[in-house]
Amino acid sequence: MPEHGRPPAAPDWPRLARSLAARLSDSRVAVEAPLGALSTYRVGGCARLLVEVGTAADLRCLAGFAAVERWNVLVVGNGSNLLVADSGFEGVALRLTSAFAAARIEGSSVTAGAAALLPVLARRCAAAGLGGLGWAVGVPGSVGGAVRMNAGGHGSDMREVLRWADIADFASGGQRRFALEELALGYRTSALQRHHVVVEVECQLRSSQREREEELIRQIVAWRRRHQPGGANTGSVFANPPGDSAGRLAEAAGCKGLRIGSAAVSTVHANFIQADLGGSASDVLALMTEVARRVRSHSGIRLRHETCLVGFDEPSLRDLGFDGPGDVGAGIGERNSGGQNQESMGLEQLRGRQL
């Protein structure tokens, strides 16, 4: 406990950066590193420290150091589910490099590093004649984020294929393998906490035909191009409530095309928010708040956001009515959803019910 009840002093970030750089063999350490540039919104401030982790040994070293120092840790994946406050993130952001992106296929079993990109992995599995991961071609995130939030779309999700995940624990400093049951994957949720870092996973797919799986991927890509916008966005902003679609509810509440400052609700899909180049995270958050308010006023339904909100004042977020993932304010910045329920067409429909 600090003397006289004073809060602990802020870390000396440049000094910590030098200390980490001396301990790590193949990782880059940067002070005041822009996080917004690493997200698909392209808005937001800096992390006090960013470590681009280059080896498994460095990751273990960081986990041990973090367990002692009690850092506030943020893991940044592909940035496709991340909104960073304009004031930035008061902690250490981690980004796994391509050293954690390797994937290998043995029979119908696929082992992949946490930094592997889902669309790339989905296409590779289809080319190998394996089925079960085709839906992931439309989820622009990494494997690590997919596990943390049970990514899904088109009637399937990670729970359907995952067998285990190796997890580094930045609270204890250790690492161990979690079985599927331990991960407790639900609709866009899991048992993983902010101090857990996915390192590697194994998925069990099924034998299929290359032509069949590649045609499925072509149909999913075409469907998404018709029904979802491009631009600077993070995909689905809100999770679908049971039996309904967040996009339908937002549209019914008159939110399509709604704009606050530099952020606007897509005119293509009302569950997507797009940020202008050079815009602000506060505008995006204000627009999210307004959409949620209008939906609740119109339908009585309280939407749960899917976006990882980082660096915002947590009490203020709760005052705004956000009742989202446990990682509000310091979560895992990786894509977690491709939309489901009535939000997207199921695999059976895409295949003409040939399954």
Residue positions per predicted region:
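Structural signature of FAD isoalloxazine-binding scaffolds in flavoprotein oxidoreductases
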Residues: G44-G45, L49-A56, L83-A101, R148-L180, ...
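Short amphipathic alpha-helices in soluble, non-transmembrane regions
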Residues: L16-L20, L62-A66, E215-I220, L287-V291
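A generic local secondary-structure boundary/capping motif
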Residues: N81-L82, A122-C125, L133-V137, V147-D157, ...
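Phosphate/pyrophosphate- and phosphate-bearing ligand-binding catalytic cores of soluble enzymes
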Residues: A30-V31, S39, V43, L82, ...
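Basic polycationic patches enriched in arginine
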Residues: R6, R318, R335, R351-R353
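Anion-binding (especially nucleotide phosphate/pyrophosphate-binding) glycine-rich loop
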Residues: P2-V143, V147
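Low-complexity, intrinsically disordered or signal/transmembrane-proximal segments
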Residues: H4, Q340-Q342, Q349, Q354
